[in-house]
Amino acid sequence: MKTTKNYKFWFATGSQDLYGDECLQKVAEHSQIIVNELNKSGILPYEVVWKPTLITNEVIRKTFNEANADEECAGVITWMHTFSPAKSWILGLQEYRKPLLHLHTQFNEEIPYDTIDMDFMNENQSAHGDREYGHIVSRMEIVRKVVVGHWAAKEVQEKIASWMRTAVGIMESSHIRVCRVADNMRNVAVTEGDKVEAQIRFGWEIDAYPVNEIAEAVQAVGKGDVDALVEEYYSKYQILLEGRDPEEFKKHVAVQAQIEIGFERFLEEKNYQAIVTHFGDLGALQQLPGLAIQRLMEKGYGFGGEGDWKTAAMVRLMKIMTTGKKDAKGTSFMEDYTYNLVPGKEGILEAHMLEVCPTIADGPISIKVNPLSMGDREDPARLVFTSKTGPAIATSLIDLGDRFRLIIKKTEKEMPKLPVATAFWTPQPDLATGAEAWILAGGAHHTAFSYDITAEQMGDWAEAMGIEAVYIDKDTQIRNFKNELKWNSMYYKLNK
């Protein structure tokens, strides 16, 4: 499954014609050197494209509109080498519709005290020009990312790289289409939401299909295709029979293979990138999709259980944002399931009945067939494993009626044994504080979970979408958190 386009980012340098041609020539040379070095760094996940120096209203406006029209342009990086009068930027910024980064840097790292003169001062005015530019962007209330430091520094390049992934998430958000193969679980509140507002705000398209329409696609899959995929399963995963008859076990596995192929063909044909199911509405499906859904998530599809389209879209979004990341540890649909409350060993067991993505697995992955009381179907096959260790984030997008809120929590990890894929987490700053803050914020039991995305990246995405974001981390104090929720509520009510 193709995750994203071949995106690029434009590098636009601001100046003015007050300093003469020689100065402007150096501005252009310096910006080209910066672009070349950024591309050679091996840190940035996407290519940076140099653009000629922006000086006049007309050129700035034309450049930003060309960026809007270029489907491969995922954002513009701006930098003021010299002073650049900000009124020249107003029209271009007004018409610009893509992610924006303000790189507050300068070409030279060190002031040449022994040789400095007015020519050097005029030529290197980022400390001056970037403030002028920053003022107009703030006055126009345009969302942008600001990165400060010398362009050659690794930490600066890493911040640019991080923003690039967020920018791609912003761009790709409007291409996320969720297929609902069932409605929400009856009487459940948190998985509900305004699908029209989600399309207005995020660009998501959420469509429902009768479960038996997709079941027909499953039934249309031929035995040869099913057998070939089952053989792939048996060569790739460990088989845990646990006393079951091998032939009977294999038949259960074959049902999931047929579901995987049928679902994927249905999604590809109708151009969907995420899917939701519900154990209470399975129609002609023989099993609740388990192994099949896990494999689809591994291929990049989003997923939400019990009709949870918001989490399905978020899983897809976060998989997009981590595409091609070196040493990626995985992104998955997840659920807060049960607690360990032993003093000193507090934590949350995160799992779901079946559907946890194997990209987060650590060590061997096995296929098991176990009974499942929900769904009233035959015992489903599923992949089981333990998850990787290390820090991660879990996000919950909720609908508060007047706005969406993204809750972002940081976690740490260890691990027990269960008949489903699992992860065991201690939320920051501790279980009691983290859980209390989560409940106060209205967080769901389903989450979109990732080792490979930072809380800052998800917060930047939320800001670009114009929605509230709250963070639960090592600095969370309940008194302050409750006040933050109250202040946010007032802000979003007044800012309508």
PLM feature segments, named:
Residues 25-41:
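Short catalytic helix/loop segments, enriched in acidic residues and glycine
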Residues 73-83, 101-103, 272-277:
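Periplasmic-binding protein-like
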Residues 231-232, 236-324:
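Long, internal scaffold/assembly segments composed of regular secondary structure
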Residues 300-423:
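C-terminal catalytic subdomain
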Residues 375-496:
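Extended hydrophobic packing segments that form well-structured cores
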